[in-house]
């Protein structure tokens, strides 16, 4: 069982600028921005490392060069295609750092919905109104969900989700009764994008 000893350095969804490259690196260069550099360097004394991308300095890999040279990495075993699927990628010119940071989260949103079995005709209930809930809402619609309902408690965020994801219904749980508004409705999938045991119990009532 993995345990975390505090204080620890977090960070696995970050952005970094390459300062130095090794002699066998061919497809990355100093000055390139990359997503998700890995915190594989020794942290400051007194700290442990949990992903550690916020360590100030981190590492990335020239995966294409490694594959061409026959170099293996334990990380590759988790990927169908190391070159296409490796999370640390060069950021295109013109893409902002905040947008680049969201790329890994968006991939996880899409993967989660696929794993949950969301498909054309699904009914999806999402609790949360932050960036993750927005991504889930967009991808649920993209996958063909016939009903996407979002429950949150920030009117401006819910309005943004309604505008961008074209969801069927948004509810503010602070001012509206979720049970009353959704009475009699059932959903194939319920996703807690806020992180609350109470939400899990509440959402389970609406599952088919």
Regions found by a protein language model. Give the residues of each.
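Glycine-rich, N-terminal phosphate-binding loop of Rossmann-like dinucleotide-binding domains
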Residues: 38, 104, 194
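Glycine/Thr-rich phosphate-binding loops of Rossmann-like dinucleotide-binding domains
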Residues: 44, 68, 134, 200-201
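Adenosine-nucleotide cofactor-binding segment
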Residues: 89, 126-129, 137-202
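N-terminal Rossmann-fold NAD(P) dinucleotide-binding loop
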Residues: 11, 133-134
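Glycine-rich beta-strand-centered segment in the early N-terminal region that forms part
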Residues: 1-43, 48-54, 61-64
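Residue-level marker of beta-strand positions
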Residues: 13, 32-33, 57, 123, ...
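NAD(P)H dinucleotide-binding glycine-rich loop of Rossmann-like/cofactor-binding domains
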Residues: 42-127
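Helix-to-beta-strand junctions that scaffold the AdoMet/dcAdoMet cofactor pocket
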Residues: 207-208
